[in-house]
Each structure stands twice: as C-alpha cells, then as structure tokens.
Amino acid sequence: MRAMKVFLPLLITAWASLPAQAASPKLIKILPQFLDQQGRHALSPSLFDRDAYQARLRRQPEQRSGLRFAVQWKGPHSTSLRMRVELRGARERTPTTAVLEETLGHGGFFSHWSELTLAGDEYKNFGELVAWRATLWDGSQQVAEKKSFLW
C-alpha cells in the first residue's frame, strides 16, 4: 500500500509531462548525404554499408549527382510546419549558397523523416558543401534550429 502511494504520484507526474514534450517542435537529426548517378545514397539498407558508400562518394566527386538532407523532426499534431535548410558552399574559391524548403505534414507523438534534395544543375553550380543550417517554421516564427559546426 505504501509503495502505491509513492508510485501513483510518480506515474501521474510522468503522464502529465508527455503532452508538453510532444507539443514543442524540434529537429532531432540532420544527415547530409551524397547521391550517386542513380540517385542512391547507399547500395543496401545496412548503416555500415551506407557510411562506407558515403565515404566513397566523398572521395570520388565525379560519381555524385546531388546532395540530400535526411532530417528527423518532431512536432505537434495540430500544426503544419515548414522546414528550411540553408547551405553554404564553395566552388573554385567562390562562395555559394542554396536554400531548400519543404512544407511538412502534421506531426504527432512520434518523430518523422523528411528528405530535401539539391540535384541537377543546382548541385553542379553549388560546389562543395561547407556548412548548413536547418530550421523549422510555424508561420513566420522560427521554432527549432540545428546547424553544422562551421555555420
């Protein structure tokens, strides 16, 4: 009985904090990935193989056809968010910039993955990626941000 008096308030407190965690939009993980000539970022579903293939594409730029940002995000179910990824690069000592945007569906309790791609002539004119910044927007208000070390 005494254990129930201690356990029940802890359970109620933990349950009450769940909606607060799900309500705030956040960017969890951003993975910049090169794409090969067929638009693939990996040859198999294995994470080890993906990392090895990405290292190969980093060493051999002539095999690349684009750059994809796989972004894991979480947001409230009631809000439609917009994701924006800003890129800074360099092409033959000339600084370059690019912006990728996507309107996201409604969030929910679990996280979601979205992919934003820079490919074709835009990628060829962009050059090498130096830094990036990903943001989540609710209307005109920025609600979450993650950026690379060099941003």
Give the role of each language-model region:
Residues 22-43:
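A eukaryote-biased signal for short, well-structured alpha-helical docking elements
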Residues 142-151:
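Short beta-strand elements
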Residues 1-6:
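Positively charged n-region of N-terminal signal peptides that target proteins for export
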Residues 61-109:
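Mature extracytoplasmic domains of secretory-pathway proteins
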Residues 128-142:
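Internal, hydrophobic beta-strand segments that form the core of beta-sheet-rich folds
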Residues 7-17:
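Bacterial N-terminal signal peptides
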Residues 108-128:
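Short, solvent-exposed, Trp/other aromatic-anchored flexible loops in extracytoplasmic proteins
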Residues 41-75, 111-118:
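Contiguous beta-strand segments within globular domains
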